[in-house]
């Protein structure tokens, strides 16, 4: 797991850092798309959590949500090109630390990728116990990134 995280971090650092330096062609559209994607991921995470809290978790409900998280996780770093932070004049909770601390942001993104892939693997295997075990890592990766790189609601 540690080796996988280091590999994902290295690739994400190269791709994410290069992309983050490119200016956004339309900051408002980029922020809006980013926020819509995060809302979908939050809904997927809540749906999985709700299923696990129910008396009988439904894999047909969990699997597509876990797949969405895994699929979107690899794109997160690309959702923050330079010029889409508070300086863009667009309402966003993205903190300047995303761009001033690219290594930290890249590591947070890579941690999410690894956790989301583990959750998706557990869901694909139909292993409820493994899904239960994997979900907290996804939740921690989200919270860790939010604590550092997301500001309060306006």
What are these regions (language model features)?
Residues 11-12:
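Repetitive helical segments and hydrophobic/amphipathic motifs
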Residues 24, 28-60, 67, 72-154:
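Sequence context surrounding c-type heme c attachment/ligation sites in exported
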Residues 1-8:
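Bacterial N-terminal signal peptides that target proteins for export
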Residues 16-20:
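Sec/Tat signal peptide C-region and signal peptidase I cleavage site
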């Amino acid at each position: 797991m540690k080796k996988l995280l280091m590999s994902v971090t290295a690739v994400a650092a190269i791709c994410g850092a290069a992309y983050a330096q490119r200016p956004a062609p339309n900051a408002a559209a980029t922020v809006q798309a980013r926020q819509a994607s995060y809302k979908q991921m939050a809904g997927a995470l809540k749906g999985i959590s709700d299923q696990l809290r129910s008396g009988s978790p439904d894999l047909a409900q969990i699997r597509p949500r876990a797949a969405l998280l895994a699929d979107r996780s690899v794109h997160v770093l690309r959702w923050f090109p330079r010029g889409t932070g508070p300086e863009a004049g667009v309402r966003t909770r993205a903190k300047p630390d995303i761009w001033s601390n690219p290594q930290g942001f890249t590591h947070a993104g890579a941690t999410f990728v690894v956790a989301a892939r583990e959750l998706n693997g557990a869901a694909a295997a139909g292993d409820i116990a493994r899904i239960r075990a994997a979900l907290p890592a996804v939740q921690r990766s989200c919270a860790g990134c939010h604590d550092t790189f997301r500001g309060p609601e306006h």
